[in-house]
Each structure stands twice: as C-alpha cells, then as structure tokens.
Curated annotation (Swiss-Prot):
Gene label: ackA
Organism field: Fusobacterium nucleatum subsp. nucleatum (strain ATCC 25586 / DSM 15643 / BCRC 10681 / CIP 101130 / JCM 8532 / KCTC 2640 / LMG 13131 / VPI 4355)
Entry EC number(s): 2.7.2.1
Pathway: Metabolic intermediate biosynthesis; acetyl-CoA biosynthesis; acetyl-CoA from acetate: step 1/2
InterPro entries membership: Ac/propionate_kinase, Aliphatic_acid_kin_short-chain, Aliphatic_acid_kinase_CS, ATPase_NBD
Entry superkingdom: Bacteria
Self-association state and partner proteins as the record states: Homodimer.
Identification of the protein by name: Acetate kinase
Binding site for ATP: K14, H208, L209, G210, N211, G212, D283, C284, R285, G331, I332, G333, E334, N335
The entry's keywords: ATP-binding, Cytoplasm, Kinase, Magnesium, Metal-binding, Nucleotide-binding, Transferase
NCBIfam families: ackA
Gene3D superfamilies membership: 3.30.420.40
GO biological process: acetate metabolic process; acetyl-CoA biosynthetic process
Length: 398
C-alpha cells in the first residue's frame, strides 16, 4: 500500500510517499519557490539515506508535481516503477469550515465546498485546491482524499467556538472559532492516550509550538477548546503573529499610523510576535541565545510568550476540570528544553513536576519529562501529520 501525501502552499509543494500500515516512508521532499526565480526540488529516499537537491524552473504546481513524479519513478533513484503503484493521494486542506468534521473522498461537490471556504483561508485553500486539481490532471483515476486542519476541532461546543459579536455575523458570515493544527493535535493526543493505556476518560493539553503555535484541550479524545480562531492569528504569541490582543488596538494603530487594511494585516501576521517584541529575529533559537546573553528585549519577548502559554494551560485545566497530561510537539515544543521548562513554571499547584535533568537531554521519539511523583504526565511527542493524512486516505480509498 502506497499513499502519496501532498501539502500544497502558494509557492511550495511538500510530499511524502508512505505505507500507512507499516508507517514506512519511501520518499519525501519539497518543491519551493514555485513560480518564482530560484525554484528548488528536494528529494530524499529514506531507506537508502539518499538526498538530492536540484535548482530548476517550476513555473507552476503542474511542473513541480511532474518533477516529483519523475523522481519517484526514476529507474536509478526512484522508489516505484510507475504512478500505477500509487494507491491514492491524500491532501492537507487548511480550512474545512463547518462543512467538514472529518476527512472525505474528493468529488466535485467537495471541491466546491472547499472553494466556498476560500474567504476563510485566502492564503491556503486556493493553493490546496491547486494541488488537488493538479494531481487529478496528472494522475487521473486515482482517488483523492482531503484531510482538514480544522476538522478535529469541530467537536467544540458553541460556548467554546462562538464569538460574542452580533449573531448574524455567525449565521451570515460564518464568523466563529475554527482552530487549526487539528491533524497534529489529533495525532499527539492519540499517542498520549495510548501511552496512558487508552482510558475511557482523559484530560490532555497539547502544545503545538513552532513558528505558528496553538494549544488544545482534548477531553476523552475530543477537542473541547483550542487557541487559534477564525484564522491562525488568534491565541498564543508566535514567531511573527501577535496572537490575542484587544481588537480596538488594531483600529487604534491602523488609524494613528495611516495604514491600509492589508498593511495592518501584514503588521499583525508578519511583523509581530517574537519578531515584534525582540526586534532581531522570529527564530526561537536566536531568542534563547539572546536571553542567555541578557538582551532586555529578548527577555521581554520570552516572558510575554511564556506568560500567555501558561495562561492557556491553566485555563484549559479549568475548562476540563483538571489535567492528566501535558504534551509538547512542533519544532519548538520538541526541541526547546528552555521553552518547556519556562512554560511549566508556577504550575506546581496543578500537580505538575518536570524532571529538569531529563528535559535538558535531547532524545528522539516520545519522551517522558515528568517526575515519577508528578500527578500530571509531561511528554515530548514528535508530531506526524503526514501519517494521519496517509491513514485517513487509506481508510477512505480502500
């Protein structure tokens, strides 16, 4: 069984060829700068530890996918004889709106429904659709499955997802909290439940911390609240995104500085967060080095970020009536021992006891970070969104 997993951005295409039953990754890679000068392909055959990087023009996603297929089927460095060996194709789709609470086989009606949500994710959904249509064109007859970032959070109740705006804004404009990183939160909370012995009842907080960051309360295997909202701008302070701020501050800054809507949107999404407060970089590693060196703005940025993360952990423990486990995932969550330690400072009242010695050692895989005496399990769990997409595609396409 071979599933091709596609994650299409506006100028990028990530791919993996996976066996969802054995979890074996045959090949993976990335096409970037599609439609821009300096287009690049990265191709890796995992079992052979073979990597290739190629700079070649890719005017569109069609040329990018053709290049991927030619490498996958190459006689010398390929992993399949032809695309006939690809059983189905799974696509990451960022926004499923209220229409999709789970992954679906793609047909014309599904394509139209995804397109109808373009307003909710103007940077992502059109690119996702482009990837789907390109696969349909180049590999006709293959089953395609859409796996939505928002689907896992469709179990939230109205008290968690409604905004206290006039009700017609929800009914007519679909303005509400949707949440993102759902595939990651689903996977990590599922692994945590397995570690716990798959109990009937569980209260898990998952912290997906990367350049984009979100936190989710997962009760009995279902998302009951999450930090991101209508868009990925709400919630935690991130690399370049502001997260939660007073909406009136947006209008105040916009008017005082004479900014257009697009400029204000750019300011909140690309110039805020760690970059905005620290001023030198949006990279967590640069921030941590500057904190160690005593940079005052770095210390400020880190303390604001950790204060907000701790606030969410406490709030979600309150919403669920306690917490059994706290999990860290994502590039920062998995690799930054400082972030994990600072995030849990002051949470001893919840029964949280971090083993700082184990936390400071870099280990791969699922790692227990809590002391044996801790009432709350603390784990570092690498996410695997591609595997979730492959499994759902296999389940729906077989």
């Amino acid at each position: 069984m071979k599933i091709l997993v596609i994650n299409c951005g506006s100028s990028s295409l990530k791919y993996q060829l996976i066996n969802p039953e054995t979890e074996e990754v045959f090949a993976k890679g990335l096409c970037e700068r599609i439609g821009i000068d300096g287009s690049k392909l990265e191709y890796e055959v995992v079992a052979k530890d073979f990597e290739k990087k190629l700079e070649t023009p890719m005017p569109s996603h069609k040329e990018a996918l053709e290049l991927v297929i030619s490498h996958l089927t190459d006689k010398e460095i390929g992993v399949i004889a032809s695309v006939d060996e690809v059983d189905a194709i799974g696509h990451r789709v960022v926004h499923g709106g209220e229409e999709f609470a789970q992954s679906v086989l793609i047909n014309d009606a599904v394509l139209k429904a995804i397109e109808a949500n373009n307003d909710l994710a103007p940077l992502h959904n059109p690119a996702n659709l482009m990837g789907i249509r390109t696969c349909m064109e180049l590999m006709p007859g293959k089953k395609n499955v859409a796996v939505f970032d928002t689907a896992f959070h469709q179990t939230m109740k109205p008290e968690a997802f409604m905004y206290p705006l006039p009700y017609e804004d929800y009914k007519e404009l679909k303005v509400r909290k949707y949440g993102f990183h759902g595939t990651s939160h689903l996977y990590v909370s599922g692994i945590m439940r397995e570690i716990m012995g798959n109990p009937e009842h569980s209260k898990i907080i998952v912290c997906h911390l990367g350049n984009g960051a979100s936190i989710t309360a997962v009760k009995d295997g279902k998302s009951v609240d999450t930090s991101m909202g209508l868009t990925p701008l709400q919630g935690l302070m991130m690399g370049t995104r502001c997260g939660d701020i007073d909406p009136a501050a947006v209008l105040f800054v916009k008017n005082k500085r004479g900014l257009t809507d697009a400029q204000m949107d750019d300011r909140m999404n690309k110039k805020s967060g760690i970059l905005g407060l620290f001023g030198k970089s949006s990279d967590c590693r640069d921030l941590e080095n500057a904190v160690v060196e005593g940079d005052e703005r770095a210390i400020l940025a880190e303390s604001v970020s950790m204060h907000r993360l701790r606030s969410y952990i406490g709030a979600y423990a309150a919403i669920m009536g306690g917490v059994d486990a706290i999990c860290f995932t994502g590039g920062i969550g998995e690799n930054s021992s400082m972030t994990r330690e600072k995030a849990l400072e002051g949470l001893e009242f919840l029964g949280v006891e971090l083993d700082k010695e184990i936390n400071s050692v870099r280990k791969k895989g699922n790692v227990k970070l809590s002391k044996d005496s801790s009432k709350v399990l603390i784990y570092k769990i690498p996410t695997n969104e591609e595997l979730v997409i492959a499994r759902d595609t296999f389940r729906l396409a077989k």
